[in-house]
């Protein structure tokens, strides 16, 4: 019987090709709009490290006071050098790392080749285990290397391919800014999006890849300039990179791993105690105004997920509902026009359930055809999101099995 219902439905649809095409197009465009928008929203709103994000915290210390706060009373988003170094020395977290963005030049061994400008971060040794960074070869450096300001480096697999042909380069040397550095680890295609470990400088998303990671104190001692954001509430008294370190300018991102709520509470008390000490010493002339947010809350406070993607998703879902309602209305109008046909079939003995089944089959064919068209248009939509969204966000949208299943 089902094959018979399909045959009747196809005949009915062929009798009104224009109306049939309109209904299929309506569903197809509604599905494509909602799924394309959802693919973007899913990419930008995903948890980059779901198994650990609740244990990663970003501390904020108010070193500027009331005059440097925004309307919401928030302290600076980053840290100055003085506070970051003190938190590192006190080491009240399970794991912790200060970090700032660098852009060193790599001098190839082949003198005929031009230097390579790279991007990366200066971090502490605990950065790698804290963020569960995957390695293709080797590992991060040891804590002793931080203390000794050792000339060691962790590089990306992309840079490893360019410099060493993709071979295991651990133990080999490379020239960075005119100095030899020993490779201790090669990352395994690690480029989390959103780039949660330095939201302040990346805005959460970046098309670029961090190719080098150097010891924080080593980079400072070598005078590697900050390639990220620097915000000041007063002009530094000294010029240059050394003057930046002695100023109240904020340019260092900081992250700490805390196992549970009790550890987070203890760490928050430590931050407040530290601010009290600075107040008593005369450095701060205001009461503590610190923050300690876990990673999801931190990304929310930084508005990592663009608000327009949320609005676009709601609008697209609303459009899908409108399309489905319109299609249902068109089908209902079409079925009501066939009331005489239904009466004749009922007079000949057709059961009410049989007529319902035929109409449902016809509606199902429209839905399947619209869904298939929507699938095709979704693929085209994902390819074209770069025309309306920033490149660093558009490149994250993709068609995969989950999206196909939802479509």
Put a short name on every predicted segment:
Residues 15-49:
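Short, strongly hydrophobic transmembrane alpha-helices
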Residues 6-18, 325-366:
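Intracellular coupling helices
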Residues 37-163, 167, 176-182, 192-195, ...:
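Structured, solvent-exposed hinge/loop segments at the ends of secondary-structure elements
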Residues 317-327, 365-368, 375:
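Hydrophobic transmembrane alpha-helices
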Residues 363-407:
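Small-residue-rich transmembrane alpha-helices
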Residues 30, 343-351, 370-378:
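A short glycine-centered flexible hinge/capping loop motif at secondary-structure junctions
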Residues 126-140, 151-303:
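Mid-to-C-terminal secondary-structure elements
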Residues 302-318:
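N-terminal membrane-entry
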């Amino acid at each position: 019987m089902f094959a018979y219902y399909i045959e009747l439905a196809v005949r009915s649809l062929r009798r009104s090709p224009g109306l049939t095409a309109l209904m299929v197009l309506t569903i197809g465009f509604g599905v494509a709009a909602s799924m394309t928008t959802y693919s973007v929203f899913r990419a930008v709103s995903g948890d980059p490290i779901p198994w650990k994000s609740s244990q990663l915290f970003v501390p904020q210390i108010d070193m500027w006071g009331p005059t440097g706060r925004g309307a919401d009373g928030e302290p600076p988003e980053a840290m100055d050098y003085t506070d970051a170094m003190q938190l590192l020395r006190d080491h009240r977290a399970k794991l912790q790392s200060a970090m700032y963005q660098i852009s060193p030049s790599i001098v190839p061994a082949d003198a005929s080749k031009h230097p390579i400008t790279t991007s990366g971060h200066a971090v502490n040794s605990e950065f790698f285990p804290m963020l569960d960074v995957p390695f293709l070869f080797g590992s991060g450096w040891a804590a002793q290397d931080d203390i000794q300001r050792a000339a060691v480096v962790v590089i990306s697999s992309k840079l490893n391919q360019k410099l060493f042909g993709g071979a295991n380069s651990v133990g080999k040397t490379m020239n960075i800014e005119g100095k030899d550095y020993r490779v201790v680890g090669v990352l395994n295609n690690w480029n989390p999006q959103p780039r949660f470990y330095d939201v302040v400088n990346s805005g959460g998303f970046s098309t670029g890849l961090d190719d080098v990671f150097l010891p924080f104190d080593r980079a400072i001692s070598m005078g590697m300039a900050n390639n990220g954001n620097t915000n000041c509430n007063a002009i530094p008294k000294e010029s240059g990179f050394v003057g930046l370190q002695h100023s109240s300018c904020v340019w260092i991102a900081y992250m700490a791993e805390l196992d549970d709520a009790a550890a987070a509470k203890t760490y928050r008390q430590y931050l407040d105690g530290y601010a009290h000490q600075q107040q008593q010493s005369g450095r701060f002339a205001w009461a503590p105004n610190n923050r300690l947010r876990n990673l999801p809350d931190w990304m929310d406070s930084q508005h990592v997920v663009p608000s327009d993607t949320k609005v676009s998703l709601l609008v697209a879902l609303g459009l899908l509902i409108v399309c489905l309602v319109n299609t249902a209305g068109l089908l209902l109008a079409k079925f009501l026009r066939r009331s005489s046909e239904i009466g004749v079939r009922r007079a000949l003995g057709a059961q009410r359930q049989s007529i319902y089944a035929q109409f449902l089959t016809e509606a199902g064919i429209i839905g399947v055809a619209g869904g298939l068209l929507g699938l095709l248009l979704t693929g085209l939509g994902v390819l074209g999101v770069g025309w309306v969204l920033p490149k660093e966000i558009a490149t994250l949208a993709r068609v995969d099995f989950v999206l196909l299943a939802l479509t």
